[in-house]
Structure formats: structure tokens, C-alpha cells
């Protein structure tokens, strides 16, 4: 019995991969997995429990205890709606810091693969194309310049009423890019066979259409 098809979309922080992936899933009637949210959920849960971000072993043991669910673009952790709580910049930074631990990445692999259900799945996030779903029917690496990504993140935060400085966001993204590209476990890279989509000058609709055309 063949497994349901997977479209895997990867890329650097704030490249728009989440927005594009969720819209592609909606258009195709597929399930959607925001794997980056899983790391943010671990970041939030570990912060609440006072676990040191450097303690990979304890963080890895925490993962199987978490009850995680996605419902109508809302994200729940142990029954609590944490959709907004995990999008706070401090949680994003914490998630990036704890993602370097192999214990966490291996603990999350099985959880991510469990989202592969009929009629199909669009998965976005780090190493979805290279590690989690290497047999994905379509692999896309979504990218944009750091300046373009910082500008988008700035607009998102301001629209939500969250104060932010463009210079700080740009510096944060550049630091995160460097950390994500150089880490020993699952560094940020273009997976074998992936199509690269440069979105600096594309609208969301144009990016979605391109992915659908490739599929």
C-alpha cells in the first residue's frame, strides 16, 4: 500500500514557507504540518517547566509527554490554545537554540511522520525534505534575502500590535541563519532534488501558484 503524497517545503526563518505551505494544503485539500511550530511548542513547554535550553537530554525526554494538536489553524498544547504564545520572538529564539540538540530532533521525527495521512500532506519546516520525508513527491526550498524577510516579519508584528525594530529583526535573522546553517545536526540546506523558489520579489499568491504548478 503506497503512502499518501507529501509536499515538503523548507527554507530559512521568515521566508514565508508557513504561509505558502498552509495555502497550498488548503488548495489541494491536504493536511498541513508546521514542523517549526513543534520546536516552538517544546520551547514554550520547557520554559514553563524551567528546563535549561542547553539540557538536550531532559528536553528530549519532555517531547513524548506533550499532547499536541492542530485544529483550524489553531495550535494546542496539553489542551491549551497556544497559537499566539508560541509566536513571541523570545520563544522563536529559544526554539532555534534548542533545535541544535539531536535528542529533540530524533524525538520529533516520529511525531512529524504521524501527520502523513490521506489524501496527502504539505509539511513545512527545517529538514522536512531532507530528513523527515526524503521520499516527498515535491521538495521546495523557499528563500528570500535577509532584508526582505526582516521586512515581512516587521509588518507581521506591527499588524499584530507588537512593537519591533527593523534593524533588530534583521540582525536576529542573520544570526539565526548563521546558526542554522552551521549546526552539526540537520543544518539548513537545500535537499537533494529540491526546487529553489526565490520569493524576495514574489507575492504570496505568486509563490503558491508556482508550487501548485510544480506539483
Swiss-Prot record:
UniProt GO MF annotations: ATP binding; CMP kinase activity; dCMP kinase activity
First-listed, main subcellular location of the protein, grouped into a coarse class: cytoplasm
Single Gene Ontology BP annotation: pyrimidine nucleotide metabolic process
UniProt keywords, alphabetically: ATP-binding, Cytoplasm, Kinase, Nucleotide-binding, Transferase
Compartment list: Cytoplasm
Signal peptide region: none
Pfam families listed in its UniProt record: Cytidylate_kin
Binding site for ATP: 11-19
Catalytic activity: CMP + ATP = CDP + ADP; dCMP + ATP = dCDP + ADP
EC number: 2.7.4.25
Recorded GO CC terms: cytoplasm
EC class (word): transferase
Family note: Belongs to the cytidylate kinase family. Type 1 subfamily.
Protein name, UniProt field: Cytidylate kinase
Organism: Polynucleobacter necessarius subsp. necessarius (strain STIR1)
Classification of source organism: Bacteria, Pseudomonadati, Pseudomonadota, Betaproteobacteria, Burkholderiales
Originating gene: cmk
Amino acid at each position: 500500500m503506497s503512502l499518501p503524497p507529501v509536499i515538503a517545503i523548507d527554507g530559512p526563518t521568515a521566508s514565508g514557507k508557513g504561509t505558502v505551505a498552509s495555502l497550498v494544503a488548503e488548495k489541494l485539500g491536504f493536511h498541513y504540518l508546521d514542523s517549526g511550530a513543534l520546536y516552538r511548542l517544546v520551547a514554550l513547554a520547557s520554559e514553563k517547566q524551567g528546563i535549561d535550553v542547553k539540557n538536550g537530554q531532559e528536553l528530549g525526554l519532555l517531547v513524548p509527554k506533550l499532547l499536541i494538536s492542530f485544529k483550524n489553524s489553531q495550535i494546542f498544547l496539553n489542551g491549551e490554545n497556544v497559537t499566539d504564545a508560541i509566536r513571541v520572538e523570545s520563544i522563536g529564539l529559544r526554539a532555534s537554540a534548542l533545535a541544535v540538540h539531536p535528542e529533540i530532533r530524533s524525538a520529533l521525527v516520529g511525531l512529524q511522520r504521524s501527520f502523513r495521512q490521506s489524501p496527502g500532506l504539505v509539511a513545512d519546516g527545517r529538514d522536512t525534505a531532507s530528513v523527515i520525508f526524503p521520499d516527498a513527491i515535491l521538495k521546495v526550498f523557499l528563500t528570500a534575502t535577509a532584508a526582505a524577510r526582516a521586512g515581512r516579519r516587521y509588518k507581521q508584528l506591527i499588524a499584530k500590535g507588537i512593537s519591533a525594530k527593523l534593524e533588530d529583526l534583521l540582525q536576529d535573522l542573520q544570526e539565526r541563519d548563521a546558526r542554522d546553517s552551521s549546526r552539526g545536526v540537520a543544518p539548513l540546506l537545500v535537499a537533494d532534488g529540491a526546487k529553489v523558489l526565490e520569493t524576495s520579489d514574489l507575492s504570496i499568491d505568486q509563490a503558491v501558484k508556482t508550487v501548485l504548478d510544480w506539483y
